[in-house]
Structure formats: C-alpha cells, structure tokens
C-alpha cells in the first residue's frame, strides 16, 4: 500500500456516485483516529493538511506516519495539501512525496488565478500529482485563513467551465453557499448553481466547508456531482470537547494516553458519520 494521488480515488467516486471524505489532520492522534475508522469501514480517505498543520508537524514526519498506517491497515490513502498558496511550497512538498495538492488562488482575479493554477498543474502533472483549485470564494475561518462575508462570492458556472479548460486542473472546489467553520444558522446551499456547474464541468467537484452542514444537504450535493467532501472544524470540536469533559471529571489527570484516547474516540464518531453520509464505506477491498 502507498500514498497515492487523489485523482484515482475521485475518478472511482465520480463513476460510482459517492464522495470521498477529506478529513483535516493536525497531529499523530488525529491521523490515527481517522484511519482506524476508515480501515474498519473500508472507506477511501484523503488526509488533508493546511500550511499551518505542516508548521506544527513536519511534512516528512506526517508522510512517514501515513506510509506506515497505509501498510498497517492495508489500504491506499491520499495525503493532500489543503489551501496552499505558494508554488514553491507545493513544489517542495511534491518532491518529498505528496501526490495531491490544492493551489488556492481564489483571492485573485480570474486571469491571475488561472495563471497561478496552470503553472502548478504543469509541474504537478509531471510528478503524477493531482491538483485541486478553487473558483469562487468561501467565507469563514480555517487555521490561518480568514475570509469575511463581503469578500466571499459564489462560483459562476460558465467561468468554471473556462477555468477548467484553461488550467487543466483535476478537481474543482466550488462556492455554493458553504463556509469554513460553524454556522450561526442553517446554510443556504445553492443546489441549482451546483447542478449548472456539473452540466458544464467534467472534472470532480469538491465541497469545502462541510462541517455543520445538515447531512441531507451534503447527500444532495453528492447526488448533484460532488465527489470530495472536506471536513475540518467538526473534528476539532469533537476532539477538544471530549478532552475538556475528561479533565472536568479528572482534574488531577495527566496521562495523555487516557485523555488523547477520549478525544480520538469522539473524533471517530464524526468520521464514521461522514463516511456514511458520503456513501464511501466498503469501496476498497479488504
């Protein structure tokens, strides 16, 4: 087993009408918790790390952990660079073995976004690395990234078509009403916009900001063509909440083997639910 490109995972998902969950990772415990569930449920998985994650724990260490777990659980997995904005940073990490990258130029005007993404695609494809890009812009907060509501905008279907044609990108993250983080009220998802994008764009579509979105909404986006579902905030909240509760009950506790396991178990329940929502269980052979 090995670290593979997301391209192969998403192509199968697109052909068979399900989505691959992409879970954000932060340390060894979060990687282990996610993969314990994915192994049990035989679900393909994408482990996504933001630039902030790779500042916290070195790429080489994350890559070694993922490679070891891939062998332990006898399953392929994808290690994905989430919301990276630097070409040079992506090049370095691809040379180190990563085979999936998101170059985020969504804050640039269309032409500049195209230019940036095309340059990354040209390099990454020479290394068998798949590339995701974003058109439109999600609001909210994720790690070091913060986008206010006034700066967020939805994806235009015809621009999406042109963007994919001009860049050769392997998958496209679309802005259809979700946001990073949690919601103060139920999000208004533009399903019609998603359907119109699907009609003119052939590559796999990606839903960012899926934390806290009602399950039935996520299922509907998958029916309309989403093949990768990103989850971050819900994982962190479950983990942190369980650890806080453990310390409230065990104020003198100090053994990370106990409180980390409590956090991991809480996170695993979120992972299990998202796999069921995505319909990705039993998609890889035992």
UniProtKB/Swiss-Prot annotation:
SUPFAM superfamilies: Aldolase. Pathway: Carbohydrate metabolism; D-tagatose 6-phosphate degradation; D-glyceraldehyde 3-phosphate and glycerone phosphate from D-tagatose 6-phosphate: step 2/2. It is an enzyme of class 4 (lyase). Its EC number is 4.1.2.40. Zn(2+) binds at residues 83, 180, 208. The active site is at residue 82. It catalyses: D-tagatofuranose 1,6-bisphosphate = D-glyceraldehyde 3-phosphate + dihydroxyacetone phosphate. Gene3D superfamilies: Aldolase class I. InterPro entries: Aldolase_TIM, Class_II_FBP_aldolase, FBA_II, TagBP_ald_KbaY, TagBP_ald_KbaY/GatY. Dihydroxyacetone phosphate binds at residues 181, 209-211, 230-233. Keywords: Lyase, Metal-binding, Zinc. Catalytic subunit of the tagatose-1,6-bisphosphate aldolase KbaYZ, which catalyzes the reversible aldol condensation of dihydroxyacetone phosphate (DHAP or glycerone-phosphate) with glyceraldehyde 3-phosphate (G3P) to produce tagatose 1,6-bisphosphate (TBP). Requires KbaZ subunit for full activity and stability. Belongs to the class II fructose-bisphosphate aldolase family. TagBP aldolase KbaY subfamily. This is D-tagatose-1,6-bisphosphate aldolase subunit KbaY. The lineage of its organism: Bacteria, Pseudomonadati, Pseudomonadota, Gammaproteobacteria, Enterobacterales.
């Amino acid at each position: 087993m090995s670290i593979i490109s997301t391209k192969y995972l998403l192509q199968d998902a697109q052909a068979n009408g399900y989505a691959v969950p992409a879970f954000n990772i932060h340390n060894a415990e979060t990687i282990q918790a996610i993969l314990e569930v994915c192994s049990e449920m035989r679900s393909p998985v994408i482990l996504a790390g933001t630039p902030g994650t790779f500042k916290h724990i070195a790429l080489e260490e994350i890559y070694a952990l993922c490679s070891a777990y891939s062998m332990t659980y006898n399953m392929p997995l994808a290690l994905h660079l989430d919301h990276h904005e630097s070409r040079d940073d992506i090049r370095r990490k691809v040379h180190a073995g990563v085979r999936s990258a998101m170059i985020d130029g969504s804050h640039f005007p269309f032409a500049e976004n195209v230019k940036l993404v095309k340059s990354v695609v040209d390099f990454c494809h020479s290394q068998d690395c798949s590339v995701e890009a974003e058109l439109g812009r999600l609001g909210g907060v994720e790690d070091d990234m913060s986008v206010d509501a006034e700066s967020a905008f939805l994806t235009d279907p015809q621009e999406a078509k042109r963007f994919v044609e001009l860049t050769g990108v392997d998958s496209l993250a679309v802005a259809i009403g979700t946001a990073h983080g949690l919601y103060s009220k139920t999000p208004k998802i533009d399903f019609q916009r998603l359907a119109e994008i699907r009609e003119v764009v052939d590559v796999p579509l990606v839903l960012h900001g899926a934390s806290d979105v009602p399950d039935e909404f996520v299922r509907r986006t998958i029916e309309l063509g989403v093949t990768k579902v990103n989850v971050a905030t819900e994982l962190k909240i479950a983990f942190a909440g369980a650890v806080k509760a453990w310390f409230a009950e065990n104020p003198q506790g100090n053994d990370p083997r106990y409180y980390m396991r409590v956090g991991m178990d809480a996170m695993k329940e979120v992972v299990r639910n998202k796999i069921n929502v995505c319909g990705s269980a039993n998609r890889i052979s035992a």
